[in-house]
Amino acid sequence: NSEALFLSATMPDYSKLFDKFLPDVNYNKLVTDRTNFKYFKKCEYKDMGKTSLETIAENASRCKNALIVVNTKKTSAELYSLVQGEKYYLSANMTPAHRSRVIEVVRNKLENGEHITVVSTSLVEAGVDLDFNTVFRQLSGLDSILQAGGRCNREGKDDKGYVYVFDIDETYRKGSDLAMRINKTKGLLEKYQDITSYDCIKEYYDGIFDFNQSRIAENSIAKYNEQSNSFDRQGLMSPYSIPFRSYAMQFEYISADTISIVIDDPNDQTCHELVETLRNGDMSVRRALQKYSVSIYMNVFKDLYSQGVLKDHGTGIFILVNQSYYNNETGL
């Protein structure tokens, strides 16, 4: 027997999924009284509609401090070049170690009340404890917008913080998950004055589940359990018959079209020593080097490799050997 506890600021209503795919699972909603939720509202969401990156950069520069979150690394790099004044950048083009250093600098600047602007992709929306007076979030899924809002007036130091949702001319693959979430959120921004309300969040996730019903059914654990006869006569699942290999093959958290490369940071003694250890053939440092690595698409990898700036020294782990390709502000 086991129990699972789901916690989120943007909690979906899983009852429809459980009832359909896991009908024998017992579940309870731990929070049913929402009357006091209003006391936790520390920011207000405003829809700016369609605008330009130049306008966003200009508006952010007028704020006490600001975080701008966009959907793609390409857009973040373009926006960062437009921002004036003291600015910082965060994206997956930077190694985890590099991002951690920047986050620590930003945190200190914010605590000292300094006027700064941070441009980031969605990675700042989870597990990053920063507190901004103002947040600008490019139109995305409602869950992403609300997570970005969690970085606004986080500690309640101001009477109210502001989250500005903006749209720009950007094309997404038709039928993609992001395109679907954006279209759903557009309608909710028009319909609801308060997009943090329970009804708004529920309608958003209901729409997401309805859109993805066939895909959920195709990839559900229940389907594989039925196919593999995982249940005994009492209807209990045997752990020895669970098709773990099938689950693993279906689950892809990181795209298979990417490859991780190590960035040898000459300014980081620990990183440099790990790289030297790897060059000497000691593969035990592979895990430690993950914090000094960046994942890139195969076409980018092939381009860098053809230029002779990636070497694996016979280890199968590629290292960027030309540091001019890695920017101290924006990464690779």
Go through each PLM region and give its residues:
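Conserved catalytic network of the ASCE P-loop NTPase/AAA+ motor domain
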Residues: 1-2, 61, 108-113, 127
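A short beta-strand-to-loop transition that corresponds to the Sensor-1 phosphate-sensing loop
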Residues: 7-11, 70-73, 120-123, 139
